[in-house]
Amino acid sequence: LNICAAVECIHSYSLIHDDLPCMDNDLMRRGKPSTHIKFGEASAVLAGSSLLTLAFEIIVDQKYLLNSKVKNEIIRSLAICSGHTGIAEGQELDLKFENKQKKINQIIDMQKKKTGKLFNFCLYAVGSVANRTEKEKKFLSNLGEDIGLLFQLADDFLDNKGSRKLLGKPVKKDNKKG
């Protein structure tokens, strides 16, 4: 359960930061004002950053009975998935590609990092807790990344074809940004 809570912290941090004016500048999230709209930009940055570190605090909590090897594997994987080669890099690519023509492989790379890496972590963590082999954990990681990519493709499709009422946010925003 602690790993699930940590994942939700990482997910929430990434959404709060993604909505910031310096990123996507989304005013709504799930039909409600984005964090920076409701509490201000500085508080949103601090909230997102706090959630990122809280995820690791939750995993290392002593009351959860993970052995040190598994705990270290999970911490390392979560850092990789959320950091400079994962979610953060995916966000950077999103900014870099804004209003530019993109090749399909660039879109896939960005989406695998921005969204797929968190799904990657979820399945890897299951393999770690279940003491699976490295080969099995690698398979689970790749499967998670592919599921994340499919999720993001579906989200992009809904952004293009859905309605504000259905999604709880303005639609066709991603299309306008290229």
Task: Give the ranges of each region predicted by the language model.
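Active-site alpha-helical segments that house and flank conserved acidic catalytic motifs
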Residues: 1-23, 76-88, 116-127, 137-165
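Acidic catalytic motifs of isoprenoid enzymes
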Residues: 1-100
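Divalent-cation-assisted or electrostatically stabilized phosphate/pyrophosphate-binding catalytic cores
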Residues: 25-52, 99-118, 138-142, 162-178
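Short helix-capping/hinge motifs at transmembrane helix termini and TM-loop junctions
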Residues: 131-132
